[in-house]
Amino acid sequence: MGPPPSLYTHAVGPRSRLISAVAAAAIVLVALAAPARATEYFVAPGGVGNGSGSFPFGRIQDALDAARPGDVITAAPGTYAESLSSVRGGSPDAPITLRAAVARTAIVTRASRILTVSHAYLVVDGLVLDGQYAPDDTVRVTSSGNFLVLRNTEVRRSSRDLIDMAAPVGVLIEGSLLHHALNAAGGRTDAHGIVAGAVRDLTIRDTEIHTFSGDGVQVDPDRAAPGWDRVTIEGSKIWLAPLPGPENGFAAGAVPGENAVDTKAAPTNTRSRITVRDTVASGFRGGFINNMAAFNFKEYVDATVDGVTVFDSEIAFRLRGPATGALVLLRNAVVYNVTTAFRYEDNIQNLRLWNSTVGLNVSRAFQAASAPKATLDVRNLLSIPALSAEASSASNLRANASSFVDASAHDYHLVAASPAVDGGERLDDVTIDRDGLARPQGSGYDVGAYERAPTTARGQAPATGPAGTR
């Protein structure tokens, strides 16, 4: 069962669907490889038994105390007023799995931390973890909580962070809903959706994060050695909106958060790498801070941003130097309904903005801040706002609404008569568009985030696979 519908919907792109399908197949293989002697423990509210199907435990923690590698804990629908801690780890081919019998119906809640993971190879699937706005993280993952899988799980209501990780390796957060990390102390205090230290190989996939007073995702506030690396965010949604009513000290109408993604990394560490693809961010405006941005890439990071959409925000991408600042490759982006699409600062170097579309209701495509010596490489940019000096390359084009299928509905696919069709230059690092269609489809690269597919005799674009195969 997938995540429940929310007020904010987004269709996962073909690349994310392919990645998710591969991941699902791997999960099946792991399940088949589980030891034949694995035990399934059952838990139900009010149970007083030994964990059997007919005589279940009453507490999930009792099952965690008993579980060994390969075992499965199944929690019946209901409310469990307890805090949970891992007791022992699983193994690569035999994780310990804690799952809800019916997704999102087993609710673990109390005014405290709800889950502490300090052992490797634990899978948490389909639970609701509710911290009741306690002054603690809802989920804490220590540096020993390697290869945690948090799948199809709702994590909510913290006055600190919803998920706080030290420096584990290989954590996967997938198909989950994280919301309401709010701390109104001092007017507004950081409470993040996900915050991580020197993590490695963290993946956040097909996950929705909203309503926080810090950042949706932040790495690493402590800038700890040896530094974080290989963080991936894909197929996800990160958003803010004015609060519909008073909430944990904030007034109705407040927009308490800062950024969808915020990076911090010490120049004495190895440069930290982050990839964000097929992800949507919105609502980053009208808050408590100046220069409110969806994506705030700064310090010693190497960021690849592909197929990202930003709207209803003050700044879509805030990109910050200097030479020891962010290295950024941004391609296949679509930006609309923002004040500034790209703000570049502090003499950022080697900023590459390729094959992206700046749509309607954007006050300015570029804004420089303390950046007289910044170096930008802007190519194949398609922009409804006027092109500025940053986009002086001949491959960049100004467009009007008639170049697109339906600009008023923010559908920025190209029509056949658009001057952007075959009007760009070849970029070897941009091999597909944001739909997964191979570039080029015609005699040359199209300008902007979308490649226009050739039409069949009936005037319909042919079906394409995730990499543009037919």
Question: Predicted segments — roles?
Answer:
Residues 22-31:
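Bacterial N-terminal signal peptides
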Residues 40, 70-72, 77, 95, ...:
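Detector for repetitive beta-architecture
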Residues 43-82, 418, 446:
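Acidic Gly/Asp/Thr-rich repetitive segments characteristic of extracellular carbohydrate-active
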Residues 72-77, 89-138, 182, 399-402:
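Right-handed parallel beta-helix/beta-spiral solenoid domain characteristic of secreted/periplasmic
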Residues 76, 87, 99-101, 118, ...:
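Feature marks extracellular polysaccharide-active and adherence modules
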Residues 83, 87-89, 93, 278-281, ...:
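Predominantly extracellular beta-rich ligand-binding scaffolds that present long acidic/polar faces
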Residues 85, 93, 109-115, 133-142, ...:
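Extracellular beta-strand/beta-solenoid scaffold signature
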Residues 418-470:
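Surface beta-loop-beta hairpin patches that serve as ligand-binding interfaces in beta-rich domains
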